[in-house]
Structures are given as structure tokens and as C-alpha cells.
Amino acid sequence: MVRADRDRWDLATSVGATATMVAAQRALAADPRYALIDDPYAAPLVRAVGMDVYTRLVDWQIPVEGDSEFDPQRMATGMACRTRFFDQFFLDATHSGIGQFVILASGLDARAYRLAWPVGSIVYEVDMPEVIEFKTATLSDLGAEPATERRTVAVDLRDDWATALQTAGFDPKVPAAWSAEGLLVYLPVEAQDALFDNITALSAPGSRLAFEFVPDTAIFADERWRNYHNRMSELGFDIDLNELVYHGQRGHVLDYLTRDGWQTSALTVTQLYEANGFAYPDDELATAFADLTYSSATLMR
């Protein structure tokens, strides 16, 4: 179903289901078979959501070993690279003395529970109320405790999340580290720019930002993606990202941030794989997404 302007979701529907999909891939990366990342919460969170296809994926009940694009190790490797990028971003920020951290569209992200945060750190998680409530309750039922102070900001990012964040205690006068992981493609281009405008307005000099982006989201309407989606559907994965993403050129984002005083750096997904000791796949689908870009930035003004 195509997106509506004020659509809502939980972790089993629409954009929310993509958070469950990502968590399932994190669970594969964390599985002892591969042990590429440390995330003991991904698999139980996926099981708690109750989407059959992702529960079967984390429980190794989908026969995909012979399909190169759905090979579990391939999925695990890709998600490990992404997860390590954002994990290291936050750890580097702590080493620089930053003490407040904002995870936008936090989904089933458990970094507040699993990373080694310095004493006094505050992690703000911003997402839909339904998503925040589910994750908080599920992790509590699992007996998990945050590794540092965790403050939830239950708000739609299309609403006044900046005020809600400050109401939760965020201090715009001191540096912060922000992440927008797996978020930008689900925003219209103008909403993406507005998101970065808000981040800039709330950031003191020395603040840091990490995100990834697809320069041209038209790839999700490409025949290569359609072929992949059709194969996904055969296996039970019925999320059509082409109906969830907002199309448009995103390649301006680095220049946009630079004009606002951010010093940016970027890695293509191919370079990110290489930095983690992996070879990027060379099949049709991987080639289509070879310009996926991971970026970090520091506010210099």
C-alpha cells in the first residue's frame, strides 16, 4: 500500500516492519555462526514482534542457502558493516567527550543497552509511541537494563520532535551525537532537509552526525529491485520498499550540510565493506546499490 501523508505504523506494518526486518538481519550478524556484531537483543525483539517471516529468518527456518541474494551470511555481512559503522560513530563520540546522544527513528535499536557508555551519558531514543512502548516493555520483560540513562521521546518525526526532545532534557547548548540510520529514504526530500535543519539548530559546535543515504531512490522502482522483490515475495517477505520510500534525488545532502557548517566525510558501501575486510558482492542487485553512502559529520561553526 502506498504511503499516505499522515500514515501511522507499528513494528509489524508499513515503515515499522522495516525496523523488524533490519533487526532480523542484525540477529543474523550476531548469531554465533557468524558473530560479526554483539547484539543479544535483536533476535528476541524480532520474535516478540511476531511477524512469521522474520521469526523464521532468525530461527534459521527459511531455506535460502542456495540463493546468493538471500544467503544468510550475505545478509549478516551487510548488516554487520552498517551496524559497526554506527556503533563506532557513537563510541568515537564518547571518546571526544560528548555526553548526550540522539537516535532518530530508533526502531528496535538496542544501543542504549549494549554499548559501553561512559558514566553520565544520556541516550535519547526518538520514534513513534507504538514503537517506543513495545521495545521498552519487551526489553523489560527480557530482564534487560540500559547500560546508561535512556530517555525515550515518543513522537512522530513529522511532528514537533525538536520541542519534545528538549522537554525530555536535551540541552542544545552542549555538543551531541546524532544518528539517522535507515531513515532518510522514508522521508520526502523536503522533509529530509527540514530534519537536518532541526538537527543543526539544536547542535552546539562540536556536535556529530551519522547517517546513510541512497543518492537516487528511483533504484527502488528499477527492474533490478523488482526482480529482487518478486523473489522476496516467494520466500514470504512481502514488504515492498518501493511503496514505502519517497522518491527523489538525495545526492545534495552533503553539500546541504556543508553550507550549514558541517564538515562531512563519506564512504560508499563498497568502501565500507572493504574497511571491514569484506568483498562487496558483484551481482545485479548489489551493483544497483553500489552508490549507497555512509556519512559522518562534525559541526564546526
Curated annotation (Swiss-Prot):
Annotated protein name in UniProt: Putative S-adenosyl-L-methionine-dependent methyltransferase Rv0830
Enzyme Commission identifier(s): 2.1.1.-
One family name in Pfam for this protein: LCM
Superkingdom field: Bacteria
Keyword Iron: no
Family per record: Belongs to the UPF0677 family.
NCBIfam families registered for this protein in UniProt: mthyl_TIGR00027
Residues that bind S-adenosyl-L-methionine: D127, D156, L157
GO molecular function: methyltransferase activity
GO biological process, one term: methylation
Keyword flag Glycosyltransferase: no
Function: Exhibits S-adenosyl-L-methionine-dependent methyltransferase activity.
Gene source species: Mycobacterium tuberculosis (strain ATCC 25618 / H37Rv)
Gene Ontology CC annotation, any one: plasma membrane
Keyword terms of this UniProt record: Methyltransferase, S-adenosyl-L-methionine, Transferase
